[in-house]
Regions:
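Short basic (Lys/Arg) and small-residue
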Residues: 8
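Extracytoplasmic/secreted envelope proteins and their assembly/folding machinery
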Residues: 18-26, 65, 88, 121, ...
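Extracellular/periplasmic solute-recognition and catalytic clefts
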Residues: 125-136, 153-184
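Active-site-proximal beta-strand/loop segments in catalytic clefts of secreted hydrolases
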Residues: 4-5, 80-81, 138, 157, ...
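Surface-exposed binding/hinge segments that line
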Residues: 3, 16, 20-22, 29, ...
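Local pocket/hinge segments that shape ligand/substrate recognition
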Residues: 34, 38, 146, 178-184
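Gly/Pro-rich hinge or "lid" segments in bacterial periplasmic/extracellular proteins
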Residues: 54, 63-65, 73-74, 80-151, ...
Length: 184
């Protein structure tokens, strides 16, 4: 059972609720969404029932849900299928982050800065597709006074040579790929 801290709000000022977590987890684990990392909820009671199929691949329990309940606005109750020694590590993974139902009903909720709502330290200011995503400090973040970087730019590139060049000349501080010929 988890109790949310007081004063948590989304970047648009609405309160973060236990219901946001319950909705997000049910959504991420659902066969309908088939999220890439939805399997990470397999440790939560109810997941196996959600994904049980007959020999033809038809879901046996279309109404099954995770055993995750918002007891009130601030209290989330979670029942795992078994003891999970790495539970806290799972909770740190983005698949476990809350999302609001009214926000994700918009297809562009995660790709359009005008509809992007979050509760983390940064929010999306702009996204130039195939170029750069710019994040800015979220003034509504519960610990905003401790966030020292005002802006973060994520440069997007499929070209490992371009990435390495930008890293070497100091334009980029971090890259996630290097050209194969640079690996010894």
């Amino acid at each position: 059972t988890y109790t949310l801290r007081d004063g948590l709000v989304w970047s648009d000022g609405q309160p973060v609720t236990a219901g946001d977590f319950a909705f997000a987890w049910q959504r991420a684990a659902s066969p309908e969404l088939a999220a890439d990392y939805g399997y990470m909820f397999e440790v939560v009671d109810g997941y196996a029932d959600m994904w049980a199929t007959d020999d033809d691949g038809n879901f046996l329990n279309p109404d099954a849900q995770l055993n995750v309940v918002a007891l009130d606005e601030k209290t989330l109750q979670v029942t795992t299928a078994n003891y999970v020694a790495y539970w806290n590590e799972l909770l740190a993974f983005p698949t476990y982050f809350p999302v609001r139902e009214d926000v994700v009903s918009n297809d562009a909720w995660a790709t359009d800065p005008s509809t992007y709502v979050c509760n983390g330290p940064y929010t999306m200011e702009s996204w130039e597709h195939n170029s750069v995503i710019t994040l800015v400090k979220n003034p509504n973040f519960y610990d905003a006074n401790e966030i020292t970087m005002e802006t973060i730019n994520f440069y997007l590139s499929d070209d490992a040579n371009n990435m390495l060049s930008n890293f070497k000349n100091g334009d980029w501080e971090l890259i996630d790929d290097v050209p194969t010929n640079e690996i010894t």
